[in-house]
Each structure stands twice: as C-alpha cells, then as structure tokens.
C-alpha cells in the first residue's frame, strides 16, 4: 500500500505518534513522540479503517496485532488546517469492529477514579481485587452489585450484594443506570453507576472487576478509568494458581483441565477484541508476583505523567 516502502514509519500497539501533516487523504506524515528518529508515513484514519477491515477478514488469528497504536498527538500549527480525525470523533471510531486511532494528551500523574480489572473467568482478577482492597482500604473500594434474588437468612444488605426487587432493577436498567446487568437462574444481577459515583465522590478509587464489554460504558471523562488486562498464562500455570487459591481459601470449586483451557481461549478472545482499550497488560502467571507488580504500577500513576484520551479534557 505504501507509495514507497522506505517512506513508511514502523509502529506497534501503544506507540505514541505525533502527526506532522494530514494533507494527503490516505497517508499522514508522523514520527514517534519525543524521539529523534526520522518521520515517516502512516495510514490515515480512513485508509486504516479499510485496511483493518481487510485484515480482519483474513484467516489469521494474529491479524489483530497489526496497525493500531495507543494514541496520536496532533502537531499544532499557526495556520488553521482541516483536521480529518479529531478527539470528538474518537468514540465513533474507537468502538467499531474496525480499530483505528485515538488522539491522546499527556497530563500530570493523578489518582484514577476507577480501576478496571479485565480478564477471563478463572484468571484471578477477583483475588487480585481483594488483595488490593486489603493492602490499602483507605484508597480502594469495591462497587458492590445489586441482585433481585431473595436474601439468605445470614446475609446483610450491602455485604456482598444490595437487594432490590426485580421490577426496580428493570426500571433502573431501562434508564441506563447499570454498567453491567444480567439474569442468572431467573434473578437479576448488576452494578449500578450510582455506586461507582458514590465511591469516586468519596475520594476513593473504585475497583471494578467487570466484563470487557463494560469498558465502553465507563470509559468517559466522568470516570477516567485505568484499564488493566490480566492475561491468562499457560494451562499449567493456571492450574498452579488455582491450587494456590484453594490453599489460601479463595476458591472451593473443583476444576478440570478443560476449564483451564477454556479460560485460556477466553483470554485470547478478550485480548483480540478489546486490546485497543487496555492501558496495561499483565500476564497473570503468579498471583503474588502479579499483585506486587500491579500494586507498584498503580502507585506510579499518582506521580508519573499519563496519556489519556484527549476527548476527556475537551
């Protein structure tokens, strides 16, 4: 596709590029941000959209590895020019099946209002969530979900669930009041946006171990979430982690090899479909090691500069 191969600029996921020129409708001139490397050509948002559509149609499970980078920085010019892709369009582009670019801005370190822990069932995200809470209860809080199922005699409202009638939960759902909502064995379960807002307004960080599909609803200027993907390791590592979890009392159910293989397949599918929304990826092959790395990384967000979607600041 390139008019000249040597003119192209190599890039990969999460690279930050500075756009120097958008004069050509198909090829933009760009360079790696804060780098002395030479400038080169990259596909425009329009061409990239077409290119990704073609790649996704190929029988290649690794096709998603090509073409998307974390963000674009539009070079400021004194002369007004027509901008083909701007931050206000990011929502329209970013959440389509075809993944393209997103304009970003660099800001000072701050406490993210929401931390989203994303991962396949059985990868250990709830265990890591609980470990984060235990390590710093003054900083983190869990968004307790709601349910319409009957309350057991030994349960307290607000302990593991808030209990509401099915009619009231359905009404809240119709008003888009849930970030997640579903039905299990005839009972509704869901996490309310008002719960997240209450935690954020209290000054704490809300920890969400939500499904990947919920990212699109929470990824707004109001919540400014930091999205962490916990990737599944090998089946043998998953089994070892599961045995550790059982020994620590985190889980009681019995799992078979096919359960671990299912976790690995689901993890790959989540990464393929939502990788463009992740801020950080950890391979969760050891709970203690992953927790230590995750905790230190989240601590660094308080002081180190961060790239965020530019539309959050406009």
What are the functions of these language-model segments?
Residues 1-206, 212-314:
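Glycine-rich phosphate-binding loop of ATP-dependent small-molecule kinases
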């Amino acid at each position: 596709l390139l008019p000249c191969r040597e003119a192209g600029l190599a890039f990969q996921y999460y690279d930050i590029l500075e756009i120097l020129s958008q004069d050509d409708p198909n090829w933009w001139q760009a360079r790696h941000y804060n780098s002395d490397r030479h400038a080169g050509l990259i596909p425009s948002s329009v061409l990239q959209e077409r290119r990704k559509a073609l790649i996704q149609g190929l029988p290649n499970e690794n096709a998603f590895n090509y073409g998307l980078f974390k963000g674009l920085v539009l070079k400021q010019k004194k002369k007004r020019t027509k901008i083909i892709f701007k931050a206000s369009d990011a929502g329209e582009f970013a959440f389509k099946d075809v993944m393209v670019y997103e304009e970003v801005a660099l800001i000072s370190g701050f406490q993210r209002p929401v931390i989203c822990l994303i991962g396949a069932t059985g990868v250990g995200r709830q265990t890591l969530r609980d470990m984060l809470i235990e390590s710093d209860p003054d900083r983190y809080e869990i968004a307790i979900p709601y349910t319409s199922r009957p309350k057991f005699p030994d349960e307290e409202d607000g302990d593991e669930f808030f209990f509401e009638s099915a009619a009231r939960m359905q009404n809240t759902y119709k008003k888009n009041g849930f970030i997640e909502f579903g039905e299990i064995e005839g009972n509704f379960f869901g996490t309310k946006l008002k719960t997240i807002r209450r935690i954020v307004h209290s000054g704490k960080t809300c920890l969400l171990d939500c499904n990947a599909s919920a990212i699109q609803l929470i990824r707004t200027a109001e919540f400014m979430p930091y999205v962490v993907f916990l990737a599944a390791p090998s089946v043998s590592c998953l089994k070892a982690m599961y045995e550790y979890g059982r020994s620590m009392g985190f889980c009681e159910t019995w799992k078979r090899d096919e359960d671990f293989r299912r976790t690995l397949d689901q993890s790959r599918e989540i990464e393929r479909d939502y990788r463009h929304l992740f801020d950080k990826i950890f391979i969760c092959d050891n709970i203690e090691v992953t927790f230590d790395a995750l905790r230190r990384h989240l601590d660094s967000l308080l002081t180190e500069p961060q790239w965020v979607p530019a539309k959050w600041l406009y």
